[in-house]
């Protein structure tokens, strides 16, 4: 093949792929390997040696990739605890319901950080997050505060927009009653949208 290598040992290892040469043999079961590190890992299956220990629970593994895969189990457990704690705290605070995702890092001797996106929780559509007219702690602009006379302003806009008196009369009477109904039924934010 046309592959090039900067080191001769890499070239030698690669050539073994093409030739099928396996110069490293296990003395216990006579199995052959193309790389010495694969033989070393294989011998651990016979000796029971497990040099890689989990930093969290202490479980030991023969290969480092097995420990790395095992460590992810602990991280998923921590992520679930963080999500559960986040969902509990967001239900008590209306501001936290719109928080962005948070990256959490877990330190270990592996020297790797694992981001943990915290699920964003939104309040259900049934309970409105907009303040109702009864709440005075959350000032929200309404038609009454934005326009001193909401119905009069709307009537004059309709009258100037539509020169026909028939159209003006139809809209002004319906709008006046609709606005008074809206003011008593909906929150200020809903009136603004309408």
Curated annotation (Swiss-Prot):
GO CC annotations, alphabetized: cytoplasm; nucleoplasm; nucleus
Annotated site location: Interaction with DNA: 3, 7, 13, 31, 35, 59, 63, 69
Keyword ATP-binding attached: no
Top-level taxon of the source organism: Eukaryota
GO MF: DNA binding; DNA-binding transcription factor activity; DNA-binding transcription factor activity, RNA polymerase II-specific; double-stranded methylated DNA binding; hemi-methylated DNA-binding; histone acetyltransferase binding; promoter-specific chromatin binding; RNA polymerase II cis-regulatory region sequence-specific DNA binding
Region ranges (Disordered): 66-88
Sorted UniProt keywords: Activator, Biological rhythms, Cytoplasm, DNA-binding, Metal-binding, Nucleus, Repeat, Transcription, Transcription regulation, Zinc, Zinc-finger
Main location: nucleus
Zinc fingers (C2H2-type), renumbered ranges: 1-18, 24-46, 52-74
Pfam families in alphabetical order: DUF3432 (PF11914), zf-C2H2 (PF00096)
Extent of Basic residues compositional bias: 69-79
Biological processes per GO annotation: cellular response to interleukin-8; circadian regulation of gene expression; interleukin-1-mediated signaling pathway; positive regulation of DNA-templated transcription; positive regulation of transcription by RNA polymerase II; regulation of protein sumoylation; transcription by RNA polymerase II
Transmembrane segments: none
Nucleotidyltransferase found in the keyword field: no
Compartment(s) where it occurs, according to its Swiss-Prot or TrEMBL record: Nucleus; Cytoplasm
Domain notes: Binds to DNA motifs with the sequence 5'-GCG(T/G)GGGCG-3' via its C2H2-type zinc fingers. The first, most N-terminal zinc finger binds to the 3'-GCG motif, the middle zinc finger interacts with the central TGG motif, and the C-terminal zinc finger binds to the 5'-GCG motif. Binds double-stranded target DNA, irrespective of the cytosine methylation status. Has reduced affinity for target DNA where the cytosines have been oxidized to 5-hydroxymethylcytosine. Does not bind target DNA where the cytosines have been oxidized to 5-formylcytosine or 5-carboxylcytosine.
Family, similarity comment: Belongs to the EGR C2H2-type zinc-finger protein family.
Known function: Transcriptional regulator. Recognizes and binds to the DNA sequence 5'-GCG(T/G)GGGCG-3'(EGR-site) in the promoter region of target genes. Binds double-stranded target DNA, irrespective of the cytosine methylation status. Regulates the transcription of numerous target genes, and thereby plays an important role in regulating the response to growth factors, DNA damage, and ischemia. Plays a role in the regulation of cell survival, proliferation and cell death. Mediates responses to ischemia and hypoxia; regulates the expression of proteins that are involved in inflammatory processes.
The protein, known as: Early growth response protein 1
Organism this protein belongs to: Coturnix japonica
